[in-house]
Structures are given as structure tokens and as C-alpha cells.
């Protein structure tokens, strides 16, 4: 269920922005990029007719529709969009307190499951060496493409960390994952732990 508040002042501001686009039926689309991770960002974009996804949730507002990416809905729970006018014009604010919170279930997308394991199980251990690992992308054949950073980039022990730590943990927790691949440039050893 959609639990997002768009205040009257935000609706007025957004409606005025949309009217300037001179596009009949234009709305907004709200989504979270990198949901459930520390890098999560809540975004609002124009949504021209035909750009909404079939699975999007729709909120009918005064003068326009707001579309919400289905995958982002759990991360937008209790989100609030507000507009506060000031001397310089005003500011649109988006508060999404659950955007960085992992919300994983059996039917969650595999990318969310990978990010959950990386940020909650793997990275806390790597942080003791000043390192981290993140998901770059998931290939069509189910391979997780990972990038190491911090003390892990260029570290001589990264192969062992990848195979015996990261890959083993991910494969145990996410059986549908085909494997992992590291795309980090390890020739840069400036921050390497070992």
C-alpha cells in the first residue's frame, strides 16, 4: 500500500512546474535509486504520457498524476514531499526515512538481496580494514558485478576476500545468484590494506 504524502504546497509547486512543460498529461514519477543502501537517493522526475511503467502505483492529485515505481514503494513508506516558499523562491524537500533501510523478502529483486547482504554482512567486516564492496550491476545470466573500494582496492588479499568471503557469503544467502565477478582496478594500490 502506498504511504506517501505530497503536501498541498508541494502539489501547487509541482503543478506549476508541470504546466510550464506544455505537455498534455505530464505527471511526476517518484522512485528510489539504490534502495535499501547507504547510497539511496529519492528522486522525482517528469513523467510524460507513456513513460509510466505498467506496475507503477498511481496517485491522482489535483491537476496531475504522481507515479511511484513499484520496486521503490516499500522504501517510500512514510515519505513526505513538501514545498516551503522563501525569499529566494522556495525549496522542494523530499523526506523518505525508509529509503536507506533494507526491506528484503523472498520475492525481493535479486539486486536488493545482494545489496542487503553486502551492506549488512560483508561491508562491516571489510570496514575494519578500511574497505568496502558494492554491486555495480547484475548481468542477464545472474552474475553479480562487484567493485571494491577503500582498503580493498589494490589489496594483495582481495582474491581471497572475494572467493572465501564475499562470494561464499553471497552464494550461501542468495542461491539464485550464478556467481560474482570483480571489476575493480587493483593496479591502484594507494589505499591498499596489504
UniProtKB/Swiss-Prot annotation:
Keywords: 4Fe-4S, Iron, Iron-sulfur, Metal-binding
One example of a Gene Ontology biological process annotation: iron-sulfur cluster assembly
Residues at which [4Fe-4S] cluster binds: 152, 155
Co-factor binding comment: Binds 1 [4Fe-4S] cluster per subunit. The cluster is presumably bound at the interface of two monomers.
Any one Gene Ontology molecular-function term assigned to this protein's record: 4 iron, 4 sulfur cluster binding
This protein's record includes keyword Lyase: no
Cofactor(s) for this UniProt protein: [4Fe-4S] cluster
Alphabetical list of Pfam families matching this protein: Fe-S_biosyn, NifU
Superkingdom of the source species: Bacteria
Protein function: Involved in iron-sulfur cluster biogenesis. Binds a 4Fe-4S cluster, can transfer this cluster to apoproteins, and thereby intervenes in the maturation of Fe/S proteins. Could also act as a scaffold/chaperone for damaged Fe/S proteins.
Subunit comment: Homodimer.
Family affiliation: Belongs to the NfuA family.
Name used for this protein in its record: Fe/S biogenesis protein NfuA
Amino acid at each position: 500500500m502506498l504511504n506517501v504524502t505530497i503536501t498541498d504546497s508541494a502539489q501547487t509547486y509541482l503543478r506549476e512546474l508541470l504546466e510550464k512543460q506544455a505537455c498534455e498529461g505530464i505527471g511526476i514519477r517518484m522512485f528510489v535509486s539504490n534502495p535499501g543502501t547507504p547510497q539511496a537517493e529519492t528522486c522525482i522526475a517528469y513523467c510524460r504520457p507513456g513513460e509510466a511503467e505498467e506496475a507503477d502505483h498511481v496517485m491522482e492529485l489535483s491537476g496531475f498524476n504522481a507515479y511511484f515505481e513499484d520496486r521503490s514503494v516499500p522504501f517510500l513508506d512514510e515519505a513526505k514531499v513538501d514545498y516551503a516558499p522563501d525569499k529566494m523562491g522556495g525549496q522542494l524537500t523530499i523526506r523518505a526515512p525508509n529509503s536507506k533501510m533494507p526491506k528484503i523478502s523472498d520475492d525481493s529483486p535479486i539486486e536488493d538481496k545482494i545489496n542487503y547482504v553486502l551492506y549488512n554482512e560483508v561491508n562491516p567486516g571489510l570496514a575494519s580494514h578500511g574497505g568496502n564492496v558494492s554491486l555495480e550491476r547484475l548481468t542477464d545470466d545472474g552474475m553479480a558485478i562487484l567493485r571494491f573500494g577503500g582498503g580493498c582496492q589494490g589489496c594483495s588479499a582481495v582474491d581471497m576476500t572475494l572467493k572465501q568471503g564475499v562470494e561464499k557469503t553471497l552464494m550461501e544467502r542468495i542461491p539464485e545468484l550464478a556467481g560474482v565477478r570483480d571489476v575493480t582496478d587493483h593496479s591502484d594500490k594507494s589505499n591498499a590494506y596489504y
